[in-house]
Structures are given as C-alpha cells and as structure tokens.
A protein has these predicted regions:
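Charged DNA-binding/catalytic regions of mobile-element recombinases
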Residues: 1-179
Length: 179
C-alpha cells in the first residue's frame, strides 16, 4: 500500500501531554511533516533525551516514508523494551500496515485531531529546526535541503545543548544516563 487517502485506525492518546520519560526507549514521538511542500521529513524522537533517533525523507507521502523511519527506531530497542510511539492522526499512522508493524514491538498513541499541544515536543523540534535551519536560507534543490536537515540533525543530537539536561546535548545525556 503506497498511496493512502484515509486514516483507518485512530489510537488512544496514551501520553495525554505527559512528555516525561524515566528511561530511554520508553516514549517516542513522531509526526508526518511537509517541508517546502516538496520534501517530506519523518523524524522519531526519544522523549527521555530529546534525541532524534530515526528519520526518513521522501518526495511523496507514501507508507515507505514512515516504514523506514520506524524500522530504524525499532532496530535500537532491546527485546523486552516496548516504547509508546506517539504521533498525530496523519493518514500514514492510521494504516493497517503501521498498526501491524507496531504489534508486539511498540504501543501506539495518537494526539487528538487538530491539537498540536498533544505532541508539543515534536512541534517544538520543528519550530527550532525551521528557525535555525530554514528561515535564513534558500534551497535550490531537494537534495540540498535534505543534506542541510541531515547535517542539522547531527548538530542537534550531538552539540545543541538543552537546559533541561543541565547543558548537555541529547547524545551526551544518553551517554551519562547509560554510564
């Protein structure tokens, strides 16, 4: 199933705006988002350290966009871990294929329709990405835009400090958590 038009499944909002996580791979957030209406970007963020742990790009909103992102994310978890994966009610997150991919590996959660506050952490990430990466630049190709986002993700994960983590980057916080 590549072209999807209608959400067939709506999951309950398990996070209910509780964006805290006491362990890595406990709660993940994602959103299906359009940048410049020509490049689709689908990131997955771990709420424990605010690290973008998986992502994918596509030029069309096909299921393969979120499938690859989810496969990357699930490859990081240990056998007994079963994260909550919270998203908006985007069409691709309501497909039968998405629900099947999560079975036995993750628990699905969805924001209420049209309520950006139910997924505020990823919305904030997109706002930061736009202000630090897009607003002052003009991109001449999809490849240039994608390369810039990928470079920014390295910076965001490895160098961009978070006050909530006492001046550590997401990767530094994860390393400290695991030590």
């Amino acid at each position: 199933m590549e072209n999807v038009e209608k959400t067939s499944h709506i999951a309950p909002n398990l996070l209910n705006r509780d964006f805290t996580a006491t362990a890595l791979n406990q709660k993940w957030v994602t959103e299906f988002h359009v940048g410049q209406e020509t490049l689709y970007f689908s990131p997955l963020m771990d709420l424990a350290n605010r690290e973008s742990i998986a992502y994918n790009f596509a030029i069309r909103p096909k299921f393969s966009l979120v499938k690859k992102m989810l496969e990357q994310g699930l490859s990081r978890i240990k056998p007994k871990e079963c994260p909550i994966i919270h998203s908006d009610q985007g069409v691709l997150y309501g497909t039968e294929e998405w629900v099947k991919m999560l079975e036995g590996k993750a628990v699905q959660s969805m924001s209420r329709r049209g309520n950006c506050y139910d997924n505020t952490v990823i919305e904030s990430f997109f706002a930061i990405l736009k202000s630090e990466c897009f607003y002052s630049r003009t991109y001449h190709s999809i490849a240039e835009l994608q390369a810039e986002i990928e470079e920014y993700l390295v910076y965001y994960n490895q160098k961009r400090i978070k006050l909530v983590f006492k001046g550590l980057s997401p990767v530094q916080y994860r390393a400290q958590y695991l030590s």
